[in-house]
Amino acid sequence: MIQEQTMLNVADNSGARRVMCIKVLGGSHRRYAHVGDIIKVTIKEAIPRGKVKKGDVLKAVVVRTRKGVRRPDGSVIRFDGNACVLLNNTSEQVIGTRIFGPVTRELRNEKFMKIISLAPEVL
């Protein structure tokens, strides 16, 4: 579960390392975001000469959470940390060209097939 002020790792090569959630999108007073939800983030830590810089405000999609994802068969997939992939603010296209670490099958919809195809492992 991701809420405002949550720090997340960035799972792509856009140049950001750590981001902070500043808003959960979708609904007027939505409190939590789960895997596959879009959030608004600000970049807290970035590498030099990256595509993004510290202080930028972007959209991101949550790809891994410590809370995990519950499947219809009752199984739960949990991860060691919270991670997201940065998106362009207007077109919501992926900024990076590589995805690091596994992602879940819950991202498999029309919007995020690019993330599924770039990911090294889909759980």
UniProtKB/Swiss-Prot annotation:
Pfam families the record matches: Ribosomal_L14
Record-level GO cellular component terms = cytosolic large ribosomal subunit
The keyword rRNA-binding is assigned to this record: yes
Name one process (GO BP) from the record. Answer: translation
Which residue ranges traverse the bilayer? none
- Keywords attached to this entry: Ribonucleoprotein, Ribosomal protein, RNA-binding, rRNA-binding
Q: Which GO terms describe its molecular function?
A: large ribosomal subunit rRNA binding; structural constituent of ribosome
**What family name appears in the similarity comment?**
Belongs to the universal ribosomal protein uL14 family.
Q: Please explain the role this protein plays, according to its UniProt record.
A: Binds to 23S rRNA. Forms part of two intersubunit bridges in the 70S ribosome.
The record's section on PANTHER family has: 50S/60S RIBOSOMAL PROTEIN L14/L23 (PTHR11761), LARGE RIBOSOMAL SUBUNIT PROTEIN UL14M (PTHR11761:SF3)
According to the record's subunit comment, the protein's assembly and interactions are: Part of the 50S ribosomal subunit. Forms a cluster with proteins L3 and L19. In the 70S ribosome, L14 and L19 interact and together make contacts with the 16S rRNA in bridges B5 and B8.
What's the name of the protein? Large ribosomal subunit protein uL14
Question: Which organism does this record belong to?
Answer: Photorhabdus laumondii subsp. laumondii (strain DSM 15139 / CIP 105565 / TT01)
